[in-house]
Amino acid sequence: GSLYAMGYSPDDMVDLLKSEDFKRWYSGEVEEKYVYHFKKNLPTPEFFNIRFSFRDSLKSLKPQFLPTSVVNPIQMNLVFVDLYARATVACKGDFDKLFVPFRCIASDVYNKKQLIMKEGDLGDAVRASMSFPFMFKPIEIDNVLAYDGGIYNNFPTDVMKNDFHPDIIIGSVVSANPTKPKENDLMSQIENMVMQKTDYSIPDSMGILMTFKYDNVGLMDFQRVDELHDIGYNRTISMMDSIKSRIHRRVNLDNIRLRRMVYRSNYPELRFKNIIIDGANTQQQAYIKKEFHKSDNKEFSYEDLKQGYFRLLSDNMISEIIPHAIYNPEDDTYDLHLKVKLENNFA
């Protein structure tokens, strides 16, 4: 949805989903040319190790035996800058000003409520809205952890009505309420624990509902994109007469292609200059900055950012880096904001 709102065509989206880059993003794997940056830990006789911070009391020690997410966020933390930073600039943080107005839903599990994402950093909004618990690591927005919006509202027709007042809503249902959990199925147990029951319906007077049965499709089955695309396309074509009978507006295909091209051509190039770091002391900040540029005023590219990012994560001093790009219209560059989490090992 976000890609379409940014000016991607359906063909553009299929190409992206089938790309080798996308496979790395959702798997957390590092590209071959950056693997050499990573150092291997020296072999030790340890059976396992426990991490804790020396800055905290030993009484508050909480050994971490399990990862917080199945998918390593190392790729996703970085690529969302490349995918979404320029679109955030183009719409000035107002999702109504994207190529197609956009909403997505995230969940504040602490306060037990949905978060309607309609402004701010587009990448953060999308990242939060897709962070299914235990599968993807959540992100922090306004000091709360934000998860997949489907926990509280998996079919937000109410949001679309209230925000956009559409004449017609076309709803696509590709999910269902969780079935009874099975003893040996962890995902079904998690779904039942976290997801609220959803009303997947649209009154005939309000719109058109298309329902798909994907019982054998998993959350990470991106390799089946052609199969799933064809199912969706064929189902839509079979309903096209009824859709056209209710939607009378027509748009020239060449015109929409041109409009997409013009909109995306206005995205400012990712050129970075200033670096702002949170989570490190003065000496550590100086060390981190040197990985990206040698002088304070020198600009660097996204490729430079990518190389420095993987180098920093290779030295076992930093456990995670969460980058954000903030645009400076005065000189057409971006400030690079880095939220850094340092390693504290005790083995």
Which residues make up each language-model segment?
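Patatin-like phospholipase
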Residues: S2-I321, A325-Y327, D332, V340-F346
